[in-house]
């Protein structure tokens, strides 16, 4: 789990969305090497401003990163990063793929998948319905994918 800390830490920096994340990985190959890069090398990446380079050089491991790591440990999720061979190749073809996926079970390109995305401020009804729906979909051998955000996304994996 500790080797994913740099992945989570980079994702937690304000201003680093999926597009910039991919550009950084394309340039430096891993978050660890991103953090080791000089400010000068960082600003060579399209979209990285001097201010953002400073933020990258001084990351703050906040509560959200600690909560994500705790969730991975408790639920025993496997984290598949965009540099892993298991990462779905089609996802890498979009401009802003998620840098990593939370996986329960195994990834298989021939399995039917459904993505669940929703509000972080979901109602009880929304969370309950999402859990029931996803529970039923799994019975039909569907793979549930989400960003694992609080709310509907995480409820999808609780069903």
Question: What function would you assign to each model-found segment?
Answer:
Residues 1-139:
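Short, positively charged patches
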